[in-house]
Amino acid sequence: MVLKNWSRGTGKKKYRVELWSHGKNSKKIRTIQFGHKDYGQYKDKTPLKLYSSKNTLDKKRRTAYYNRHPKNYPRYSADWLSKKYLW
C-alpha cells in the first residue's frame, strides 16, 4: 500500500491522505483524515507540514498522548497515521 496525495482535510482542520494499492493496476482504496489543526502535536512529520506551528516537542505531552491512546490500531488507520506522523 502507498500513501499518496497528501492535502488539507475537507473540513480544513485535518490532514487528508489517500491509500493506494501497489502494482501496475494501482487503484485508490480509501481516503483517511487524521489530526486536527486546533490541537498541538509533538512534531509534524507529514510531507506538507501545514500545522508545524503547533509542534510542542514536549516529551511529557507525548507520553500522555500514548497513555490516552494505548491500543495499536491497524496500519494505515487514523490512529496509526497520527502516531507515525504527528506524535
Question: Model segments located where?
Answer:
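Arg/Lys-rich, low-complexity, intrinsically disordered basic segments
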Residues: 1-87
